[in-house]
Structure formats: C-alpha cells, structure tokens
C-alpha cells in the first residue's frame, strides 16, 4: 500500500520526516509495518520551475522552431528554443533548466539548436512523466508564481512509502489509519478529518428505500441520497492526491469515493439513482445462476452464495467487491445513492476468490473495516461530493445497524505482562500505551480491564495486549538474557530411538523413506487388502471394522489405515508409472484397529517395498526373485536388533495369504515362535491390473513385537583371522519343495564349520522338466581356530549332501 507523507501530514504532524523519511520508515518497521520502499518525488523535478514567456520570435534558421525569452524570477531570463506551437508571449510554462533529468534519463544542458544557443526546455506533461499523451507544452494558469519549483506548485514535493501491511492490521490500510499508528508510536496529537455535512433539511425516504435481508452477512448498511450533482473532471488537488499514491482519476464522483477509502479506510460505492429499479436497495444473497455484468463489462454467473446489492429486478453490485455496469455513475448522472457498509470479511473474501475479482474495496473488506466508521466515511464522502460536483444532500440517511458490534473486554495484570516479556513492565507506561491505542481502561485491584476499539480486530486476548506493550515500548528494549536451563538428565524415548536406528539401517540398505497419510479411503483400502483375517494371521493386529473419521477431508480419506502395505503399493505404482522402473521404499508408522472391547488402538509397523529386477547388480542374475532381496533386507534388520531366533514359515492354508500377495511366494516371519509379519511377491493379477510390468514385493513387520526386550544383549566374538571357503551346489527339486526347509537342513548338517548359506540362483525355464526347479546354493565354511584342511571341507560337504539325499532325495546336478 502506498502512503503520501503530505497527505499523512493532514492528520498528524510529520514535519521532521520530510527531510529524513527513513527515520519514520524505521519506526514503522519496528512497530510491525514494514516499509518496503521510499520514493522522494521531488527529486524527479529538480531544476524544474515555473517560467514566464516574455517574448516569442521565429527561429532564424528553422521555420518550425520558435525562440523564446523566458523569465524564471529574480530578473533571470533564459533564451530557449522550442518546437511546440501552442504557446505565446505572456504564458506561464514549465521550464526544465540545465541540470534537470527528465524521465528516460534525458538530461537537460545548454546546447545549440540549429545554430542558436538554448538554455533549457519548455516541457509538456508527457515529457515530465505526468501524462501518457500531450498536445504541445503545458500552459499553466496566469497566476502561477514565476520561479517557484514546479514540484511544490504541482504538489509533487512529496515522499511516498510503500508499506507491507500484515493481514491483522487492516486498521492501517488508510492515511488516517496510519496517522493513528504514527500518533500512537510517537505520542503525537491526532487530527480527525471533518465529516460535517450541510443538508437541504428534507427527507429522502421516498427517494430510495432500503431492505436488508441478509443481515447475517451485512451487520451494518448506510446510504445517502444526493441530487443535482454534475459529473466531470476532478479538481487538481483531488487528482494530485490520488496520483500521489498511484491511482488514476476517473471523474469527480468516483474519485471522491476512492479518496475517502484511501483517507479513512472505508470503501464506498456510488450508484446512479436513476437506474435503481423500484427506487429500492435490497441487500440479499444472489440467485444461483443469474448473470451479473461488472463495471468493466465482464459477465459472470453467480452461484447463490454471494452477497449482492440489488434493486427490485436484478443485482447492481457484488457487495464489497465490485459495482455493476447497469448502475454505475456516468457523465449524465445527476442523482447519486452513496453506499457505506460493514460486510463480514468472510463474505467479501469468498466472493472475491470465487470469481477471481480483486479490488481495493475487496482487499479492505476481506480484512475487516471499522463498523463504527461507516457513517463517518459516508458523510465525509457526501460533503466532498457537494464540494467538487455541486448538488444537495438530504437531511436524513439510511443506517441499518440492529446489533452494534461490540468488542469483548480483556482482563490483564501488570504481572502477566512482565512474566510474558521477561522484564519488569511499568504500570504508567501500560496505561499510557492503552490510551494511545484508543482503548478504554479501568483498574480493579491488580487487574486492568481493557476495552479495545472496534477498528482493532487483532486485539482479543491478554497476549495481544502484551504484544502491544512490547511493540510500543520497543522490542530493542527487551534485555538480553541467557535462558534459564535446568540441569536435568535428558530423556530419550526408546521407541523413537529404535525407529531412528531402523530408518538409518534401511536407508543403508538402499531404501528411501516414504511418508503417507494415516487416513485413507475405505473403499480403496478394502479393495486392495481384501479380508483382514489373512493379515491378522500374519501376527499383525487388524480388524474388519474400520475407524472412521468424523470430519474427513474427502471420501478418499475417510478412515484410519489398517496396514502400511496399501500406502506403499500406491507409492510403488506412482513411481513405476513416473519412469522409476526399479526402487526400494520403506515406511515406519502407525496402523489403527478396533479392540475387542470396542476401543481404538494403534500399532507401530515397518513396511518395505522393492520393485524391478536386479539386472544391474553384478552378483544377481536377471531371474533372481525380488522377494529374496526383501527377505535379505529383513534379515539384516533382525540382525541389527540382535534377533537370531527367527524362522520363515509358509502357511499350509492359503486363506492365510493376503489377497494382494502371490500364494506361492509368501512367508510369515516368526520371532521366538511368535508371528510378527510377512514378506511376499505382489499378486500377478494385481500387477497386471495396474500395468506394472516388473516384479514387486512387500513386507510388513510389527515393530512393537520386534522392539520387545530391546536392547538385547550382544555376544561379543573376535573376528576369525582364518580364511573362508565357499562351495556352490545346484539341485533339481520339486517346485513344491520349500527352499527354506532345504536351507534349514543344510544349517543343521553343517553345524560347526558352516558360517552361512544362501540361494544365489533359481531356474524354472523350458529346459526343466515339468514340476521341477533348479536351485543354486552357496555355503561358506570357516574354522575359527585354524586354516581349514581339504579333508575337513570334504567331510562337512559330504554330511550336507547325505542329509539332503536322505531327507529330500536331492542330488547335485
């Protein structure tokens, strides 16, 4: 928002700031109103003065040029060559003398024009940047004082501030509002602009009637009827005031409404009373679907929620936003109905946003205008219209205000102020500050009861008063002090620390962390998870009954999630279709379920997802199942938690396999004999339906169970210095045979020297006979006390192979 210092000076003495505007800018910024830019307009008119043409002759060397002798006062006469033709001897003109710099960085200096010396330039308004078009040079009134600086004469000896007014300080969106703030900050006297109005003593009730129906959106509506006005250009002073803050002049009536809005912060609207059908103003909601044409000719369809100002036939104004073309003031207007109102900020804001219409009025109404300033603004505007456009005002006016807005009093003690600020507040300062703010203040005992003025929407509680004390006393006066820190042992949440450790480990395994909303769509979750009995069979707490959200954001977020798998699948699906053909994701979060007694509970889970073939890994074949990669990651997690007693189990009953997983590539995880989660490959039909063309696997673990007994004691062992021996075997086995059972048998048979065992290849191609698969297994052997001898290696491998032959009838290929 732009503020003119000269305009501000009408209401509060700011004389000392004309030479040092940065001092005022600094004070305003410290007070919470940031000054973004200071512009000294007078500098644009340095060396530009009013001149008097004494003589005008033809240029001796150019027919289209004239040679003028121009006085700039005190006996100083300049010879100036001019190319315009609209001037004559005796005219008062604007002269740019050597040293002046005009818009476009055009520097004026002494020069020769067609062989004749010229010491300046006679200017048009366009050349001074004051008009877009000009015909010839500017001719001033005959009484314009010769030699006077044009900036001072034209009202351009001004300083303007560009302010960033925060949303809570709507009371400062005007010159008087800012003057009130300056008065408060500096303790200066405030001069209130006159709203005295001379009337014709007659009643206007028969001219325009008023009916406020939507009083819930319009607590106050006032209006005046003016007749006999003459629409035309505004006087120079009014134009200059508007132009000083970047607003163009339209006509005298509209300019006055804009002037009062910029002066007092009260938006107004002027209707051509001749076009108000039925001679009645109705304040009511719009009719859904009806059309409205704005002042600029734009047609919009109303949705029925907007507050409108109407006549008996149609809307004539969108309340607080924009006027209608059908009732706007024109050159032929002679009767005006002048409106001033207090519309609820919510109403103006919604209308403005729904139709994308931002105006100076909507900007103010959306933030809140002073309901007690309505009549002052109305009468001020009416008086100015009579001054600049003539006419007469009727003695009465409309003022619908059935329930006056009242601010709630705030109770506070000086101790509260001191405690909140951290230093001793002074009672006499507090009382002074409250009075400067325009508050009514009473004291009873140690408690002050403060009644804020209606224009301060932001003062509602004691903390607001504490803030005002700190602001007016100066934030720079808050003493520097180190915070008092109590010497107490720090508390670390065990689950939080374990979650952080788990997250760091999974990131180390190449997973990236996903964070999903805890609320999901009931239909979508059920479609993905299917029956939750299968999920429950894996050891994860789940119930068919979902926990519904009372006030959901939308139907896609109406229940609390029962599993992390649904969210991770959506992440996987989105990533794949965004071009990420391979990836690893994990999430640590809560799931929610209903207990047997009907109460709600939540559990802590870890979910993991892997998709895409490991074709870019040198030690993995193209057909290496991703579920094995996921299994390996889970086992690394178990190892980090020092959990060694675990097994993978494939349920005999297929109903225990969740519907979104492959029934033949699924396993439940048992830790110390208790089910704590699952891993599995996503069901082929699910992948096909979602057009995911790579294998994918999911895991979900119950962290509440895994974290029990943490931290588990570690058994410290020295690292063997003796070499490890690897041996690879390939077996052809029935597809129905579980590889996990084979590995378990190898561990048992090779106990003593067997360090580890793992699958490194799986083949089920066309070259295999029906119902068979080829599994390649690697074992690692090590003696912790000596280098392995060949006889030891052969003895151990023989034990393993004999056991596999005996128990599974397996032989090496």
Swiss-Prot record:
Cofactor dependence: Mg(2+)
Entry keyword tRNA-binding: yes
Location relative to the cell: Cytoplasm
Domain of life according to the entry: Bacteria
Residues in tRNA-binding domain copies: 42-151
Catalysed conversion reaction: tRNA(Phe) + L-phenylalanine + ATP = L-phenylalanyl-tRNA(Phe) + AMP + diphosphate + H(+)
Cofactor note: Binds 2 magnesium ions per tetramer.
Gene Ontology biological process terms from the UniProt entry: phenylalanyl-tRNA aminoacylation
All residue ranges annotated as the B5 domain in the record: 405-480
Subunit structure: Tetramer of two alpha and two beta subunits.
UniProt protein name: Phenylalanine--tRNA ligase beta subunit
Organism listed in the record: Bdellovibrio bacteriovorus (strain ATCC 15356 / DSM 50701 / NCIMB 9529 / HD100)
Encoding gene (name): pheT
């Amino acid at each position: 928002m732009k503020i003119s210092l000269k305009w501000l000076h009408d209401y509060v003495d700011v004389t000392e700031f004309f030479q040092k505007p940065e001092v005022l800018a600094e004070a305003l910024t410290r007070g919470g109103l940031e000054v973004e830019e200071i512009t000294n307009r007078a500098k644009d008119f340095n060396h530009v003065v009013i001149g008097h043409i004494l003589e005008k002759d033809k240029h001796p060397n150019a027919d289209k040029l004239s040679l003028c002798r121009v006085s700039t006062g005190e006996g100083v006469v300049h010879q100036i060559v001019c190319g315009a033709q609209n001037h004559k001897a005796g005219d008062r003109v604007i002269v740019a003398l050597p040293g002046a710099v005009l818009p476009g960085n055009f520097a004026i200096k002494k020069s020769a024009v067609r062989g004749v010396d010229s010491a300046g330039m006679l200017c048009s308004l366009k050349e001074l940047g004051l008009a877009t078009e000009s015909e010839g040079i500017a001719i001033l009134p005959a009484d314009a004082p010769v030699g006077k600086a044009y900036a001072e004469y034209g009202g351009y000896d001004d300083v303007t501030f560009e302010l960033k007014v925060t949303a809570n300080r709507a009371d400062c969106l005007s010159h008087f509002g800012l003057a009130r703030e300056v008065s408060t900050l500096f303790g200066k006297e405030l001069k209130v602009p006159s709203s005295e109005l001379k009337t014709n003593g007659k009643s206007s009730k028969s001219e325009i009637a008023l009916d406020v129906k939507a009083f819930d959106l319009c607590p106050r509506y006032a209006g005046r009827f003016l007749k006999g006005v003459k629409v035309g250009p505004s006087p120079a002073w009014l134009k200059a005031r508007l132009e000083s803050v970047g607003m163009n002049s339209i006509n005298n009536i509209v300019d006055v409404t804009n002037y009062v809005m910029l002066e007092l912060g009260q938006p107004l609207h002027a209707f051509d009373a001749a076009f108000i059908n039925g001679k009645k103003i109705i304040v009511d909601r719009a009719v859904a679907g009806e059309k409205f044409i704005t002042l600029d000719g734009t047609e919009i369809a109303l949705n029925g929620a907007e507050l409108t100002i109407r006549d008996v036939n149609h809307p004539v104004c969108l309340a607080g936003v924009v006027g209608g073309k059908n009732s706007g003031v024109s050159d032929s207007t002679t009767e005006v109905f002048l409106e001033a109102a207090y519309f609820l900020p919510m109403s103006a804001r919604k209308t403005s946003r729904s139709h994308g219409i931002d105006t100076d009025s909507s900007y103010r109404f959306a933030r809140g205008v002073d309901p007690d300033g309505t009549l002052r603004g109305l009468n001020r505007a009416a008086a100015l219209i009579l001054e600049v456009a003539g006419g007469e005002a009727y003695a009465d006016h409309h003022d619908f205000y059935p329930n006056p807005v009242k601010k709630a009093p705030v109770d506070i003690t000086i101790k509260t102020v001191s405690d909140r600020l951290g230093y001793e507040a002074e009672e006499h300062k507090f009382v002074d500050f409250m009075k400067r703010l325009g508050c009514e203040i009473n004291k009873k005992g140690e408690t002050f009861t403060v009644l804020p003025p209606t224009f301060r929407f932001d003062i509602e509680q004691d903390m607001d008063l504490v803030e005002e004390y700190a602001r007016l006393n100066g934030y720079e006066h808050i003493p520097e002090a180190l915070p008092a820190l109590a010497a107490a042992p720090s508390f670390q949440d065990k689950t939080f620390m374990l979650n952080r450790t788990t997250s760091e480990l999974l990131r180390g395994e190449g997973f990236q962390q996903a964070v999903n909303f805890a609320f999901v769509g009931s239909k979508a979750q059920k479609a993905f998870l299917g029956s939750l009995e299968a999920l429950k069979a894996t050891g994860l707490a789940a119930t068919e009954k979902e926990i519904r959200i009372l006030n959901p954001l939308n139907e896609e977020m109406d229940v609390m999630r029962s599993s992390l798998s649904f969210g991770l699948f959506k992440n996987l699906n989105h990533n794949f279709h965004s071009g990420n053909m391979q990836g690893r994701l994990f999430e640590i979060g809560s799931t929610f379920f209903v207990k047997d007694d009907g109460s709600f509970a939540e559990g802590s889970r870890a979910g993991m997802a892997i998709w895409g073939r490991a074709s870019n890994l040198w030690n993995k074949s193209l057909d290496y199942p991703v579920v094995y990669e996921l299994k390996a990651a889970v086992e690394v997690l178990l190892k980090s938690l020092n959990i060694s007693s675990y097994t993978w189990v494939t349920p005999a009953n297929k109903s225990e396999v969740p519907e979104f997983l492959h029934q033949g590539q699924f396993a439940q995880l048992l830790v110390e004999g208790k089910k704590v989660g699952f891993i599995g490959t996503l069901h082929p039909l699910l992948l096909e339906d979602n057009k995911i063309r790579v294998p994918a696997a999911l895991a979900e673990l119950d962290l509440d169970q895994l974290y029990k007994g943490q931290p588990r004691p570690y058994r410290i062992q020295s690292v063997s210095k003796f070499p490890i021996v690897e041996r690879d075997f390939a077996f052809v086995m029935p597809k129905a045979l579980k590889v996990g059972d084979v590995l378990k048998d190898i561990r048992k048979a090779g106990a003593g020297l067997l360090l580890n065992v793992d699958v490194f290849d799986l083949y089920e191609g066309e070259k295999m006979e029906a119902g068979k698969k080829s599994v390649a297994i690697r074992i690692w052997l090590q003696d912790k006390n000596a280098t392995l001898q060949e006889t030891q290696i052969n003895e151990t491998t023989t034990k393993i192979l004999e056991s596999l032959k005996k128990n599974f009838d397996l032989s090496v290929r």
